[in-house]
């Protein structure tokens, strides 16, 4: 409980758009502000004041023109928001003759005028609101306390309260907004008089700033307090999210940025509010703008929030125990980097809080560094100085720097410490002829995208294809990973027809996605299989992979029938020659081939449910046998000199029966730098 203020200042705002329950939901700007002072001690009301506010966009809806009788010409000469607020502050100060011990508080009809209009607009325009706008009385809630028998709060408005008290509607003022302020003044006088004797003692509060913090996985979170924000700029921080929801109270540590499988932000965040009321107001900001981007806002659950922000790591809790710190994430550190080197990297202009204690290195479960770290700074100035070092060198590597959040720290540590991003294969044997997805066909109804940004998502690809996105077969978008489990910059897409695939390749080739141009090639499922096995595909045609080159041996030798499985020792042979990649199982996990597989692509990124996903990359058993198509045996030579030629290799095998020079396959091992040769003998 707090002491009752001496005065209430009744405040009513009008925007250039919707009124009533939809006020502020259309992101329209404030154009008119009314206020009136109510003396609670002497039970008197002051004069009605108003000020026109010039919006940046001089456009009024028809409903607004009809309600307010305001035209664009009158607004063009009005005061801007900061000037109007100074005029309001000066007027209230003069009327109340504010001195030592004099107090006043705003009073509004509901939450929208302060939370959905003034705070969001002032934040966007970088206008500093006076302190009085951070607390206010909601007349509807106060009326419900005063008159418990009145209608529910969501059904209350000025007209309903006036009717409940048997007041006649104010006839002295007929203008919209002015009449509401007149009636609100009369309602307040009735509430503080007999028989109600109501005291205004517990105002609503607006948070000054967002507080970061940790969240335990054991914490119970109300499902009705969480939203999912989608479409965020990738560089946005929790402070940017708090600014987008300015006026609404976010719980401590309640802004959690979501990361994708590669540990990068995916443009989504989960936000937890202090109450269901604030969550509902947040949903009204659906498709409001953050800069030039509109943000989608949807309901989410407490479980969703805990999956992202929850954690129990003592190391993280200790690191985040220092409050009011700005967190910066470092990415691309040398694996041998030490805390002393990180401290020296930032230097004296941006000292790290606590020195080495303010650095948290991210490691895998076995203790190996990931190249990521989080650093604490005591203030915004130090953090900004630190971010200016983005892409500066530490050793021989450039370091990427981003603003971060407590939830992101927890999420990254959970991701790397619990299990590898790419689980390692454990079976002691490798299937030779696993099941295949779809038989390869010569119909060129597929397209290949090459040069995608590494952070590209399924949604980015659909936006990139534009009108052709509707021609994608159900579950036909596949993003390919490299042998490290990271995006390769390639994707394969199965279209509904060869004609549409041709048109997509023609119109989208070298079209930009973000800051990169993307190459688009038409191909068939069979050509796709060739590419995934090591071949190349471009606009000049197809070059077959090594395993499809001729492999000749004396016809007199018959090769034994292959077994269903082979021991792991067979990994010394090129897998594209002797075995198929393991078939993908229906799951959302990543499926790498083992480190012994030397393929162009050893795994792919499965499309999420509802996205296009049934095209197989791997050839069927009919087109890829478990052994070379001709009788013979393949051996691998490792450690050759870089200038070794075919003649030297054949001389080396002198005395053995080997194939012709056509049976010599040149290869490069992706995991090593040593040259190798494959010889059919």
UniProtKB/Swiss-Prot annotation:
It is found in: Nucleus. PROSITE patterns: RRM. The modification Phosphoserine is found at residue 543. The modification Omega-N-methylarginine is found at residue 582. One of its GO terms (molecular function) is mRNA binding. InterPro entries: ESRP, ESRP1_RRM1, Nucleotide-bd_a/b_plait_sf, RBD_domain_sf, RNaseH-like_sf, RNaseH_sf, RRM_dom. GO terms for cellular component: nuclear body; nucleoplasm; nucleus; ribonucleoprotein complex. Epithelial cell-specific. Induction: Down-regulated during the epithelial-to-mesenchymal transition (EMT). GO terms for biological process: mRNA processing; regulation of inner ear auditory receptor cell fate specification; regulation of RNA splicing; RNA splicing. Residues 225-302, 326-406, 445-525 form the RRM domain. Keywords: Deafness, Disease variant, Methylation, mRNA processing, mRNA splicing, Non-syndromic deafness, Nucleus, Phosphoprotein, Repeat, RNA-binding. mRNA splicing factor that regulates the formation of epithelial cell-specific isoforms. Specifically regulates the expression of FGFR2-IIIb, an epithelial cell-specific isoform of FGFR2. Also regulates the splicing of CD44, CTNND1, ENAH, 3 transcripts that undergo changes in splicing during the epithelial-to-mesenchymal transition (EMT). Acts by directly binding specific sequences in mRNAs. Binds the GU-rich sequence motifs in the ISE/ISS-3, a cis-element regulatory region present in the mRNA of FGFR2. It is linked to Deafness, autosomal recessive, 109: A form of non-syndromic, sensorineural deafness characterized by bilateral, congenital, severe to profound hearing loss. Sensorineural deafness results from damage to the neural receptors of the inner ear, the nerve pathways to the brain, or the area of the brain that receives sound information. DFNB109 affected individuals additionally exhibit vestibular dysplasia, although they do not manifest problems with balance or movement. Belongs to the ESRP family. This is Epithelial splicing regulatory protein 1. The lineage of its organism: Eukaryota, Metazoa, Chordata, Craniata, Vertebrata. The gene is ESRP1.
């Amino acid at each position: 409980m707090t002491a009752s203020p001496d005065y209430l200042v009744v405040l009513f705002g009008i925007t250039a758009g919707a009124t009533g329950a939809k006020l502020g939901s259309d992101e329209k700007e404030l154009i008119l502000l009314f206020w009136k002072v109510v003396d609670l001690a002497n039970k008197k009301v002051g004069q009605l004041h108003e000020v026109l506010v010039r919006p940046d966009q001089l456009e009024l809806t028809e409903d607004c023109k009809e309600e307010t009788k305001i035209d664009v010409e009158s607004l063009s000469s009005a005061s801007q928001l900061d000037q109007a607020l100074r005029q309001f502050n000066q007027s209230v100060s003069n009327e109340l003759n504010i001195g030592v011990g004099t107090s006043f508080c705003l009073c509004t009809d509901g939450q929208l005028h302060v939370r959905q209009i003034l705070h969001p607009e002032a934040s966007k325009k970088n206008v500093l609101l006076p302190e009085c706008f951070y607390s206010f009385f909601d007349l509807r809630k106060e009326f419900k306390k005063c008159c418990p028998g009145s209608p529910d709060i969501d059904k209350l408005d000025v007209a309903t309260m006036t009717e409940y008290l048997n007041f006649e509607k104010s006839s002295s003022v007929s203008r919209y907004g002015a009449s509401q302020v007149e009636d609100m003044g009369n309602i307040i006088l009735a509430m503080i008089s007999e028989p109600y004797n109501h005291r205004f003692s517990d105002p609503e509060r607006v948070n000054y700033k967002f507080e970061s913090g940790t969240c335990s996985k054991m914490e119970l979170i109300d499902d009705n307090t969480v939203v999912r924000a989608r479409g965020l700029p990738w560089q946005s921080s929790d402070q940017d999210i708090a600014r987008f929801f300015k006026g609404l109270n976010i719980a401590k540590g309640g802004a959690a940025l979501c990361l994708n499988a590669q540990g990068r932000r995916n443009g989504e965040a989960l936000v937890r509010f202090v109450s269901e009321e604030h969550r509902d107001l947040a949903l009204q900001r659906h498709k409001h703008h953050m800069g030039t981007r509109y943000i989608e806002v949807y309901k989410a659950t407490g479980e969703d929030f805990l999956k992202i922000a929850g954690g129990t790591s003592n190391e993280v809790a200790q690191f985040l125990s220092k409050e009011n710190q700005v967190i910066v994430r470092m990415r691309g550190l040398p694996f041998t980097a030490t805390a002393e080197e990180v401290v020296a990297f930032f230097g004296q202009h941006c000292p790290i809080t606590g020195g080495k204690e303010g650095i948290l290195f991210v490691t895998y479960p076995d203790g190996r560094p990931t190249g990521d770290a989080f650093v604490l700074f005591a203030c915004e100035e130090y953090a900004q100085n630190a971010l200016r070092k983005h892409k500066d060198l530490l050793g021989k590597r450039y370091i990427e720097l981003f603003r971060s959040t407590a939830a992101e720290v927890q999420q990254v540590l959970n991701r790397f410490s619990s299990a590898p991003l790419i689980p390692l294969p454990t079976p002691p044997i490798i299937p030779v002829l696993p099941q295949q997805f779809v038989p390869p066909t010569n119909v060129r109804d597929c397209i290949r995208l090459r040069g995608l940004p590494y952070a590209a998502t399924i949604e980015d690809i659909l936006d990139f294809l534009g009108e052709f996105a509707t021609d994608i077969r159900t579950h036909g978008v596949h993003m390919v990973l490299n042998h490290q489990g990271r995006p390769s910059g390639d994707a394969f897409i199965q279209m509904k027809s060869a004609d549409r695939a041709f048109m997509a390749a023609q119109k989208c080739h070298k079209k930009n996605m973000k800051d990169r141009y993307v190459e688009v090639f038409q191909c068939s499922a069979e050509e796709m299989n060739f590419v995934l096995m090591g071949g190349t595909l471009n606009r000049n045609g197809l070059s077959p992979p090594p395993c499809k080159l001729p492999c000749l041996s004396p016809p007199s030798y018959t090769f034994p029938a292959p077994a269903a499985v082979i021991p792991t020792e067979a990994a010394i042979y090129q897998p594209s020659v002797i075995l198929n990649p393991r078939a993908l199982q229906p799951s959302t996990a990543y499926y790498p081939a083992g480190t012994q597989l030397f393929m162009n692509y050893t795994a792919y990124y499965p499309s999420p449910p509802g996205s296009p996903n049934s095209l197989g990359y791997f050839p069927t058993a009919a087109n890829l046998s478990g052994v070379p198509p001709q009788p013979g045996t393949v051996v691998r030579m490792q450690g050759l000199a870089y200038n070794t030629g075919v003649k030297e290799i054949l001389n080396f095998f002198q005395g053995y029966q080997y194939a012709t020079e056509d049976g010599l396959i040149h290869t490069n091992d992706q995991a090593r730098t040593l040259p190798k040769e494959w010889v059919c003998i």
